[in-house]
Amino acid sequence: MEIYAKVLLWVVPFFLILIIIEIVYGHFKGKQTYTFMDTLSSLSSGMTNILKDILGLGVVIVSYPFLLKHLAIFNLESSLLLYFTAFVCVDFASYWNHRLNHKINFFWNQHLIHHSSEEFNLACALRQSISDLLGYAALFLIPAAVLGVPKEVITILAPVHLFGQFWYHTRHIGKLGILEYFLVTPSQHRVHHAINPIYIDKNLAAIFCVWDRWFGTFQEELEEEPPVYGVLKPVQTWNPLIINFQHLWGMVQDAWRTRIWTEKLFLWWKPTGYRPADVSEQYPRKKISLDQPIEKYNPKMSPLQKSWAFFHWLCITFMLFYFLANYASYSSPQALLFGGLIFVSIFGFTSLMDGYSWSFSFEMGRSFCGLLLFTFPYQSNFYLSQLPIIFYFGLVYFSLSIVGLMVLHQERNLNSLNEG
């Protein structure tokens, strides 16, 4: 994980630069594809995914080394052919894992976050899951295991394959001619993120679109059918942690409420979006219809609130980068504690931007707990001796958070008086 952390220190800034370029380009072209809080939500989601991976959260059900040990028939020598074969196997596995996520209720929960934005831009590519806590994806790499692809090769290619999917999350690139026949392009992926009936569950491939063409899931982007982005049941929140478990919580509620025992057992494995008839009738949920005007989620925010949200995002981003750069200095408990602090910080500031009634109290409590974390003798001694920069930064950040919350609270009270 230490190597992966160092790789991210280079990759993430590169992604952020590309996002800034896309924002500037959209501004000058008069075709802006970004909104303020949607972008912060996407970037925050990316941070939670990085933390989940770095902290090793999850349970591996079946690993690739296990499959390789028991299934390998061939033994490919190290060569360009080996790496090309391995990359094709990784892409093939990605297609079928992606298809499973789209088709089955339970697995959709861990993929919904990626489709949750009602925009389509490079930032939304960073909406990656933290709810994929069961490690079963290696099962789709059985062809690679049979061919004897070494685990080290898969370890190298897996992040390369993931990072290679970033560039095509954009509305600024049209169709790419002959490339459309064998590579996934922005046009094809716009289709994938759309909720238009003709586009639903189409274009599931990651790099090579031949899988979609062979297995019947390919759909070309049509001029007469502009893509509408998001999910059919809007998430209605900026909080990436809530989004990650929203669909799962809905299934838990349905399983509890339905009076039919077979439904309690099997609704998890039914097609995505399935709900028991008795529950669906008694507890209907909002679902988008393209026959009616669509109002995107965008709660009203004052300039002060936007400034406050951006301040928090900058500070949390700094904390994450400092954590990645000094990952080797942390013991496992300290890494979990600091990572947990970042998780809670993201949960808090995005909840306040949603306007939840409890969010102000939560944020105030988080800020005081953050101060306590850095002033507690055991922790303060560790940070002062090993990581003094983050120690002083933490004290300033959480102190300013408390002051900022008081100012926001005063603004809220003034607005209430004016409205009254």
Language-model-detected regions and their locations in the chain:
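Hydrophobic transmembrane alpha-helical segments in integral membrane proteins
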Residues: M1-F15
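Cytosolic/stromal cytosol-facing helical appendages immediately following the last transmembrane segment
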Residues: E119-A123, W167-A309, W358, G394-G420
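Membrane-embedded catalytic scaffold of the fatty acid hydroxylase/desaturase
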Residues: S44-G56, S79-P240
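Central hydrophobic cores of alpha-helical transmembrane segments in multi-pass inner-membrane proteins
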Residues: F14-V24, V59-Y64, F87-A93, I342-F347
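Juxtamembrane "helix exit" motif at the C-terminal ends of alpha-helical transmembrane segments
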Residues: E2-K6, G56-N75, A138-I154, C315-Q334, ...
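Substrate-recognition/cap regions that form aromatic- and gly/pro-loop-enriched pockets
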Residues: N298-L414
